[in-house]
């Protein structure tokens, strides 16, 4: 069996509801007169954030900023959102279906503004009004989000809120790890804004979730290959599966060759650490 391990060395924090945490970030940032910039994956995560924002407005979890603008600035996210809006009951959970049955659009609310053209995108940063900006790519490696970072990283009143995993070597990871100077479009940018993270929102299961999935097999796997994680995490999760649950587990590095028919390794190289950008 091959299993991913993105969060194989930790448990997701579910103590505080994500809606409450997001509302706190919006409140704090708008109170300062800044922009809340959310690097977000275009499909799935952006729509999830819109769902939370609708709930925040409905429950009035942000005060003093009625109708605060929310810009969705990603062509792919806009197309994906349109598809979500056309989906039937089979695509939603019970809570969302109840909203649809009540005539409530689950991912739409007043104040949402769709940015289509590059001119629309540029106009967002020309508008001094405090706002929420959802833009891709989620790890800040490409896309319109990089322009919004250029205009907000240096502002003490703004916030960059990560809502998904940031892979090692990406700009998002460097910001999350606390880097104070980055280069965007050939310009050195000082990072003065607040950097935040919304925990538990990854589409990847944590250690317990992954272990529960493995336990679902009627017959225990003979060998578990652990991949899709940083080197330290894949090694740690493979070790955890062996020592705590009795699996024969292995975290292969790039170039490893295993003969399934013979049940043995043909090539087993050592790992090469990822260099930071």
List the predicted regions and their residue ranges.
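Acidic/His-rich, metal-assisted hydrolase cores and their charged scaffolds
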Residues: 2-277
